[in-house]
Amino acid sequence: MLKKQSAGLVLWGAILFVAWNALLLLFFWTRPAPGRPPSVSALDGDPASLTREVIRLAQDAEVELERQRGLLQQIGDALSSQRGRVPTAAPPAQPRVPVTPAPAVIPILVIACDRSTVRRCLDKLLHYRPSAELFPIIVSQDCGHEETAQAIASYGSAVTHIRQPDLSSIAVPPDHRKFQGYYKIARHYRWALGQVFRQFRFPAAVVVEDDLEVAPDFFEYFRATYPLLKADPSLWCVSAWNDNGKEQMVDASRPELLYRTDFFPGLGWLLLAELWAELEPKWPKAFWDDWMRRPEQRQGRACIRPEISRTMTFGRKGVSHGQFFDQHLKFIKLNQQFVHFTQLDLSYLQREAYDRDFLARVYGAPQLQVEKVRTNDRKELGEVRVQYTGRDSFKAFAKALGVMDDLKSGVPRAGYRGIVTFQFRGRRVHLAPPLTWEGYDPSWN
């Protein structure tokens, strides 16, 4: 590069030198002597005068040539200096320091009413909470129950206590009078979630009821799955609950296992502010959780759920009068082994990868009749698949194997693409529709 620059400078210097001298010669030839105008007649008729004029021009030209030689010398010196200069490399660009985004603040919204046993819920949350700044606890109280209010107030600044202001009765259809509690719950949820997302302006929230106890890695679980929820539009929630999470139906040696499910589990669940903006304008007057399970709300989206639940319920008292608790909820196993989820690669839960691998695993497993699964025949097969072909066969096989047999808008509890996976007598079983399955039938209720 320097050689090209030097050659260019020499060429331009030579051109300028020749052109300048030609112009000077023409100028001196036509210029009159200093102090007197030229006489044309004198020059034409007097040889001596002509000789003197030529001598004068030659002297002037000699002086100018000296000046040009000096100019040419300066050009040469400049070129020599340029050639002798050692090129220096540009200073290396400073490496860009990666900016680690600040961790998201995810509040825990505790929905409370008239259970003073909310202390058990709050004690566990505060015991396992890794950071008060990253996981503020907001207790939203309905019902106006003073003993519960005092229990919440006793935690001081460790929690934020807000109160649902509308404690009035709700007008309900005559055949729904016994369900007024469900109407009040839906009203409370709407108000409390509105406070979290519109008043406090948090980007996400984990909703728990006041009768839930959390696992040691409850916060770690939601911290790790929050980025996945934000990044994958095919997901709309993360739940801490496995509807089929009874102790004999989970693999206790694999607490790190997570799944996608088309069924909305609730009972400790993470949602984003964007989802609340979608749901709030059409929030139902009652039975909000079953409303969430309808296809109009789910829109083909899934939730993440664990193999072993990160919450358990201890509240027999409630609007369901304890029946569901006695039959099912009290048997759900709560995880006790801390899993460092934030150190795990959870990309396998993204829809494309999950569907490919999960379906290959399920339909690659040998098919076995439900009777042989129940009697633990063909143990050498290991993981197996039990195939159902309709609503009635699903319910019959589910009851025979001990899994939840109810359906909401055609979706089985913990199901994904119609498949319910669980442990039975020490081996993995997939209760699955045919491979040609085309979607849920909302009439299966």
From Swiss-Prot:
Binding site for substrate: 115, 142, 188, 210, 320
Pathways involved: Protein modification; protein glycosylation
Residues that coordinate or bind Mn(2+): 211
Keyword list, A-Z: Cytoplasm, Disulfide bond, Glycosyltransferase, Golgi apparatus, Manganese, Membrane, Metal-binding, Signal-anchor, Transferase, Transmembrane, Transmembrane helix
Cofactor(s) in the UniProt record: Mn(2+)
Record field: transmembrane: 7-29
Origin: domain of life: Eukaryota
Cytoplasmic side: 1-6
Family: Belongs to the glycosyltransferase 13 family.
Name by which UniProt lists this protein: Alpha-1,3-mannosyl-glycoprotein 2-beta-N-acetylglucosaminyltransferase
